[in-house]
Every structure is written in C-alpha cells, then in structure tokens.
Amino acid sequence: AVVKARVTKYNLGAAALPKMGANGRSLRRVLVVGQVEDDASVRLGTSTVSTNLGLLTVAANAHPGAEIIYKPHPDVEAGLRPGAIVPEDLQNLASVVASHADPLALIEACDEVWTMTSLLGFEALLRGKPVVCLGAPFYAGWGLTRDLGPVPDRRRRAPDGHPLPRPDLIHLVHAVLISYPRYFDPVSRRPCPPEVVVVRLAHGPLPVPSLRLRLLAKLQGIFA
C-alpha cells in the first residue's frame, strides 16, 4: 500500500527531476544520497566512510563510466547543517547534482542507490532497487543490501554464536512499519493502524500540527 500510494517519509512537494542521460540511457545510473554529517545515524552508524565526499568518491570509483546522480540533503543545501561538498569535487565526481529533486522520482529513475545510513536506502528497497550501504542503518546486515561497511554482529549471530535466519523484505517491512511503530491519526486524534496513516498521507490535506508537536519536532532535530 505504501508503494502503490507513493507515500514516503519525504511526503513533500519537490522540484522536477534535473536533466539526466545526456550520454544516452544505456549508461548505468547510480543515485548517491547525501546526508547531514553530524546526524546521529552517521556519527554512530559509520566507520570507514562518514562524509558525503567520501561516499560520493567511493561510489564514483566503483562505477567508472556510469551516470552518478548526487542528491544533497535539503538541510545541507540550505546551509543549516554540515555536509556540503565543494563545487570542484562535485564537478569531478558527479554527473548530475539533483538539488531539491523529488527523492521518490530519483529512486525510480536510477538503477542502484548508494548511501551511508539514509532512510532513502530503505525507500529504495521497498521499490526493488539494489542498495549499497557504507554504514549500518537498520535495514543493513540482513542480506537485503550490499554492505561495504561493518554491521553489528547481533544482526547475523545469536548470543550463543549460532547464525540467525535471514529475514526477507516482507518480514523487515512488517517489523519496521507495523510491529514497532505506534500511529496517531491527525484527523480523529486517536491511535490508528498503519493503513489509516497511508490513506491520510496519500489523500491529505492534513491538519496543521499543534504548537506542542512543532516544538517537539524542533527538539528532535536538535538532538538527532
């Protein structure tokens, strides 16, 4: 339902896709997802590569001749958070810089997604795209992604050392989107199942969040 309704975490309007495929669509198209470099998921979930420049360099070197599409994080583009790459490096490493572009449309337009720990990697998995992780996001280490960085051993082995079964994508989605979260319907203002949230997001518009929720969101951004 999430994929069919085209609902994502980034459920906002965005600019049209930049011009791609100048050298012909026969080129493999690789999406490289930039992040906020002081975000907790980057600080705690990466080791060998923990910068956007490092990620872009590794991805570009792994795909000589491919079309490298770099998606900067919106907060980095706005100058609010660290993680900017100098224009000279972008010009040398990326074929296209997809500023303010729709993340879902970018995923659909590309053949493969490279990330450190971004949730866009999970969005790409939902849509059947190969994902390469240089960090250890929650969706890495289960056999669903190609992991170039270390992932916690607890995702592969039980405390007694025995290997753990590998979940398929359906089981991961159930754990992440159904079993773990609790959902709140902004219309009825009551707890609700995930299906209701998908309908609300897909068909909107939604009520304006209260001042309390807006303040909580700001605090979450500060401490994330």
Task: For the regions a language model picked out, list residue spans one by one.
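Leloir-type glycosyltransferase catalytic cores
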Residues: 1-24, 144-224
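Short secondary-structure boundary/capping segments
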Residues: 46-49, 84-87, 129-131, 146-150
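Mid-to-C-terminal functional-domain signal that highlights helix-capping/loop sites
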Residues: 40-55
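Short loop/turn segments at strand-loop or loop-helix junctions that form parts
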Residues: 27-39, 72-73, 136
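A donor-sugar binding/catalytic signature common to diverse glycosyltransferases
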Residues: 100-145
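Catalytic donor nucleotide-activated moiety binding site of glycosyltransferases and closely related
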Residues: 56-99
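Short, solvent-exposed loop/turn segments at secondary-structure junctions
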Residues: 39-41, 78-79
